[in-house]
Amino acid sequence: MTERPPSEAARSDPQLEGRDAAEASMAPPHLVLLNGVAKETSRAAAAEPPVIELGARGGPGGGPAGGGGAARDLKGRDAATAEARHRVPTTELCRPPGPAPAPAPASVTAELPGDGRMVQLSPPALAAPAAPGRALLYSLSQPLASLGSGFFGEPDAFPMFTTNNRVKRRPSPYEMEITDGPHTKVVRRIFTNSRERWRQQNVNGAFAELRKLIPTHPPDKKLSKNEILRLAMKYINFLAKLLNDQEEEGTQRAKTGKDPVVGAGGGGGGGGGGAPPDDLLQDVLSPNSSCGSSLDGAASPDSYTEEPAPKHTARSLHPAMLPAADGAGPR
């Protein structure tokens, strides 16, 4: 093995740049064993790979102008890495959901490769924070400052941060139902149902009583409410007309004062005059009348008032059953 002079050995080795060159210039001389003879060389021995790898990256106080050793660089880098790891999750948790801003310029990303994720989350209009403390304060104050602005769209999307009195100003029907409560609604429904049932029972009872006063050809003929009302109207009109006819006949007999024979004949004539009301009654009570074919309709309980019908007044006042005039009798 031949010995090379230090100058030639330094020229043949690759040149160190940056921080490696500074460390090589500041390191003390080393001893090299050549052919059993120990000689000093000005060339620095190769440092450990982990130290060189950590020192090669740019960080706070890691450049040639920093003047710090490998131990200081390692501690500073570890502190910066731990702080960056602690800062990135805090930024992601504190920042509310919203449209992702545009990425930062390439120059800022190249200068801070370890904080690239942090730079992309920051707004594009502001530069990247220089100190970690400022970045943490910015990430905490950003959601509070942008809540009132239009960055998140409508303010109604965050009702817990905004005061919205629209519900108090314009209450909806659903809120009224919630205010009433289920117990009040059930009690009101029960009261309404009982009142309607009681009213319907009264109406049905009144129709049943009216049906008993209307004579029909089949006595047990089934009639609807509409038919009961129509037959009752016809029956009342028939009775009113019959009473008017009887009153007119009595007035005529009192004026004429005829003999009993003529009076008897007049009585027969009165009976003949009473035939049309009988025919009208038969027409009203016949099952083929127009009332039997009428459609059933809903009758209002207030459309009529229950009045006692006359008890067979037509039969008691029929002309054939009237007493004879005074002085009349068989001769």
From Swiss-Prot:
Residues 56-70, 263-275 have a biased composition (Gly residues). GO terms for biological process: angiogenesis; astrocyte fate commitment; basophil differentiation; cell fate commitment; definitive hemopoiesis; embryonic hemopoiesis; erythrocyte differentiation; erythrocyte maturation. InterPro entries: bHLH_dom, HLH_DNA-bd_sf, TAL-like. CDD domains: bHLH_TS_TAL1 (cd19706). It comes from the Eukaryota. Residues 1-27, 40-86, 249-331 are annotated as: Disordered. Residues 1-22, 72-86 have a biased composition (Basic and acidic residues). Residues 187-239 form the bHLH domain. Keywords: Chromosomal rearrangement, Developmental protein, Differentiation, DNA-binding, Nucleus, Phosphoprotein, Proto-oncogene, Transcription, Transcription regulation, Ubl conjugation. Phosphorylated on serine residues. Phosphorylation of Ser-122 is strongly stimulated by hypoxia. Ubiquitinated; subsequent to hypoxia-dependent phosphorylation of Ser-122, ubiquitination targets the protein for rapid degradation via the ubiquitin system. This process may be characteristic for microvascular endothelial cells, since it could not be observed in large vessel endothelial cells. One of its GO terms (molecular function) is enzyme binding. The keyword Transcription applies. Gene3D superfamilies: Helix-loop-helix DNA-binding domain (4.10.280.10). It is linked to A chromosomal aberration involving TAL1 may be a cause of some T-cell acute lymphoblastic leukemias (T-ALL). Translocation t(1;14)(p32;q11) with T-cell receptor alpha chain (TCRA) genes. The helix-loop-helix domain is necessary and sufficient for the interaction with DRG1. Efficient DNA binding requires dimerization with another bHLH protein. Forms heterodimers with TCF3. Binds to the LIM domain containing protein LMO2 and to DRG1. Can assemble in a complex with LDB1 and LMO2. Component of a TAL-1 complex composed at least of CBFA2T3, LDB1, TAL1 and TCF3. Interacts with SBNO2; this interaction inhibits TAL1 occupancy of the DCSTAMP promoter, leading to the activation of the DCSTAMP promoter by the transcription factor MITF. Implicated in the genesis of hemopoietic malignancies. It may play an important role in hemopoietic differentiation. Serves as a positive regulator of erythroid differentiation. This is T-cell acute lymphocytic leukemia protein 1. It comes from Homo sapiens. The lineage of its organism: Eukaryota, Metazoa, Chordata, Craniata, Vertebrata. The gene is TAL1.
